[in-house]
Each structure stands twice: as structure tokens, then as C-alpha cells.
Amino acid sequence: MANITLGGTPTRTIGSLPEIGSIAPKFIGLKSDLSPFDSNELDGKNIIINIFASIDTSICAESTRKFNEKVSTLDNTVVVCVSMDLPFALERICGGENLKNIIPVSVFRSSFGNDYGVTISDGAFEGLLSRSVVVINSNGSVIYTEQVPEIGQEPNYDAAIGSL
């Protein structure tokens, strides 16, 4: 369980992020165009999973934009932006802003939050996902994690990118 804050108010997640060196849990969801997503389709690639509560918050949208920009020059690397948002919300921001270097994925019907330990267990955002980042290498191993301590803060983009 991670202790985090939302606007300074303490809250918790149901578990912990996957351990460094472990094989990343596979997951499914829906892409913003309503097609199915299966993380197996990314086998052999470096994956940055940008996890957040809702694309409709300014920090979540900004993290999506920044990761889109930062990975544009990286080979064999993809950013998967994961939230409990409906695919329509993800399409409105990601499609509307032509963010081509990311894959927006809604996990509103999957066990992702439990499998990655990022479901918020209490407070105003209960049931949503905590802001965090997981980086997976091309062999499927977790090489970097960050549980952002305050939901209103941005993740450490440079540390995530630098872990590759």
C-alpha cells in the first residue's frame, strides 16, 4: 500500500507498484478508438506506462503531452497512457491534440489497477488510479517505477526516460 496525498489530504492505494526486476503484469483495456488493447501486442518494445486518475485534469493531460514529446526521438519505445476514463475522454484529448507517440488505454473494465497496485482505496478519488509511472524494458522486466506522492504533481519524466 502506498501513502499518497490529494491536495494535501492523505489517501492510499490498494497495493504497491511492481518490483524492479520483476516481469511486468500483462493487461488489457480499450484504446480511444474503442478497439481492444492487449499489452502482449507490445512484446519486444520498451514501454513507459503513464498512469493517472483522469485525462480531464490539467496535470494528467500535461503528463500525456510531455511523454508524447519526450519519446518522439526514441527507437523501439512506446508510451501507454492508462486511466479509468472512458475511451471517449481519452480520444477527446489525445486524438484532439494529435498525440501520435502514445497509446491511450482505458482500463475501466480490467484488473489493471489491482495488478499494478495503483487503485486508490479511499478519499475523493477512491476507485481511480494514482499518478505513477512504470517503465518496462524490451524483455518485459520492470526497470523503473515512480509512485508520485501527491496526485497534483507531475512525474519525473527525465528519470523515467533515463531508465531506458
Language-model features: where?
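Chalcogenol-based redox active-site neighborhoods
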Residues: M1-L164
